Amino acid sequence: MNKSYTVDSTCNDMRIDRWTRLKIGKIPQGLIEKYLRSGKIKINKKKIKSSTKVKTNDIVNFFNLDFKETIVQKKIKFEPSKEIIKSNEDQIIDNNENFVVLNKSSGISVQGGTKSKKNLVDIFAKSEIFQGTKPYSVHRLDKDTSGVFIMSKTRESAQLLTSLFRLRKVHKTYLAICHGELNTDEGEWNDDLIRYDGDKKIIEKAKTIFKVLDKNSEASLVELKPITGRKHQLRKQLYALGQPIFGDIKYKLSNSSRGLNKNLMLHSYQIKFIIDDVKHTYTALLPDYFRKLLKTKRLRFSGLK
């Protein structure tokens, strides 16, 4: 078995042994270790250990594996209509020779998977904007989160942007509307977030800088700047404070489900980074449902400085 794969952003920072199982099914850990030691599994043509983590756009090669490949559930292929392609093209903030920036709508995945169908990569793969190339996803943005999202047009651009995200040289600002009144107007959250890799419990450090832009007894509008990039970090941290984000059906309190909004009130508002001494700043307008809830909850938003 000789195969080559490109790691997508949904698997960024995943251990190579776990990633291997995702690709070829159930395989004994000892056999994976053997393949790694003998160089039958390599990342970017280099020998690695089982603890090595894959990064977005890494190239993983399998050489002469004598393990019979098991059936892995295939991703659902999405064929977008012309109307869907046009509606997403209308959300583009910037389109240059290296990448596209758009204001992603809530409810659409970045990439396809075994559970998700409608996704940006498949949509823009059919767009004339990516004619002669293909869209590369360079960072994560949850399906239900709206706002600034970037797709590269070339492998070189994808590798550069991915490294900027990994090295925390991309500065991200989110806006969230959460239940209740936050006690502290600004500061820093440092939390230990728990996730599971199979049966293994993993604790990850999470850091976010926050500032309350407006608040009352019913709700708070919060500016969030994540320093780390843990999965569901902002949602988990607000939930841990007992003040979950409106519309969050996963991280919610029992008494916050009443009159729950259809949309998650978490928006990727702005992204900043520097390439070749050129500053790039991209801002995504708030969706109508977000503005409507601001008005309903009597919260004011005058823009970020």
Question: Where on the chain are the PLM-derived regions?
Answer:
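RNA pseudouridine synthases
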Residues: 1-305
